[in-house]
């Protein structure tokens, strides 16, 4: 029953996401070769290889006869069929798909901070908030690689209602997508990029993708990703899993988790767990879980676009779960508070690793989804 409820909620997310899609970038189904890492999939129905990041591997997808099954079912149930990267820079504000033949030397400044973003279930890089987040980070003079794993995330193919039934497949695909993302990151490092200048942002299922990518990078001997933002990491089919099979606080030097809805993992999962407005219901969303779920991305965007800051005070998970808990708004005399603003996006910030870990109740203005600017309190 809980799974069915979760599926219905996810369908609402789908309806919301399709309503807000941006048409700025053309969605390409065939990803490209990257730095010599090649993965080939063969689809017998079209007799063409599909190139995907990774090492050489062959996969055969059987034909289902005159009526193509993927006309009715989402592509995600067939496994990882394709993925690609979109590069955003100051000179490429609209983003462009990257292939092996692209001369990244013209577009990529390896001295700048590089962000990798990963969308969630039934979404893509064209989604309005995903695109807006990438553009906002570029305005801070960061380089952004936006991972498009829409085929494996059940975005393409199939009927809307049937796509929801593909959620378990999308969950299963997060590990392989994460591994392929790691291959891409390691290729960049092999060609001169520094892991110390990199950070990840994942929303919902994309948070777990970033977690799996970080795990592989570390296990491959490249070190730990400095900073990983998990925007309301997906809960369905992850809530009972242990660290090896989901996002974990050890995946990066600092994992910052933004909790905003009931569809996200409610229990602490990062090195710094931030419960915005209590972590379950957001201002003006009321009981709309989909609104609260995507609000985690909007808060990140607001920090960059509007220079918002969000003050928080220490809390326990028991206090967070208690609907009768009261949290006093901090002031200049408050101690042990935490203020989150756009400075937190810099993975090279010296004080980043000194941030007090733990759980914080984060205050959100009900009208502006922001809080006081230049807010200070005692540390």
Swiss-Prot record:
Cleaved propeptide residues: 21-73
Classification via Pfam families: Lipase (PF00151)
A GO CC term assigned to this protein in UniProt: extracellular space
Disulfide bonds: 76-154, 243-248, 285-291
Gene Ontology biological process: killing of cells of another organism; lipid catabolic process
Record EC number: 3.1.1.32
Family: Belongs to the AB hydrolase superfamily. Lipase family.
Protein name per its UniProtKB record: Phospholipase A1
Organism: Dinoponera quadriceps
Lineage, opening ranks: Eukaryota, Metazoa, Ecdysozoa, Arthropoda, Hexapoda
């Amino acid at each position: 029953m809980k799974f069915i409820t979760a599926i219905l909620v996810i369908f609402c997310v789908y309806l919301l996401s399709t309503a807000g899609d941006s048409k700025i970038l053309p969605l390409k189904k065939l990803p490209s070769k990257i730095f010599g890492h090649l993965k080939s999939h063969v689809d017998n129905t079209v007799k063409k290889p599909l190139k995907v990041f990774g090492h050489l591997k062959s996969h055969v997808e059987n034909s289902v006869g005159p009526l193509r099954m993927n006309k009715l079912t989402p592509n995600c149930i067939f496994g990882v069929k394709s993925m690609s990267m979109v590069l955003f820079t100051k000179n490429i504000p609209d983003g462009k798909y990257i292939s092996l033949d692209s001369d990244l030397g013209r577009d990529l400044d390896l001295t700048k901070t590089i962000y990798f973003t990963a969308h969630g279930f039934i979404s893509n890089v064209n989604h309005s908030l995903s695109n807006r987040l990438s553009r906002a980070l570029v305005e801070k003079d960061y380089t952004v690689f936006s991972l498009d794993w829409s085929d494996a995330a059940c975005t393409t193919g199939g009927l809307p209602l049937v796509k929801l039934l593909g959620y378990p497949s999308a969950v299963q695909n997060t590990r392989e997508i994460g591994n392929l993302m790691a291959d891409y990151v390691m290729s960049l490092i092999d060609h001169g990029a520094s892991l110390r200048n990199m950070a990840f942002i994942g929303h919902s299922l994309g948070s777990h993708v970033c977690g799996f990518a970080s795990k592989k990078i570390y296990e491959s001997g490249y070190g730990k990703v400095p900073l990983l933002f998990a925007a309301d990491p997906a809960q369905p089919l992850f809530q009972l899993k242990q660290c090896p099979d989901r996002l974990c606080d050890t995946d990066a030097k600092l994992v910052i988790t933004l909790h905003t809805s009931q569809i996200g993992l409610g229990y602490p999962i990062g090195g710094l767990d931030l419960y915005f407005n209590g972590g379950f219901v957001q201002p003006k969303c009321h009981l709309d879980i989909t609104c609260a779920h995507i609000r985690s991305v909007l808060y990140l965007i607001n920090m960059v676009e509007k220079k918002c800051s969000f003050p928080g005070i220490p809390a326990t998970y028991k206090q967070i779960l208690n609907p009768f808990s009261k949290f006093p708004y901090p002031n200049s005399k408050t101690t042990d508070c935490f203020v989150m603003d756009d400075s937190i996006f810099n993975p090279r910030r010296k004080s980043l690793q000194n941030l007090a870990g733990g759980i914080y109740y984060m205050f959100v203005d009900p009208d502006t989804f922001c809080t006081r600017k230049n807010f200070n309190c005692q540390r």
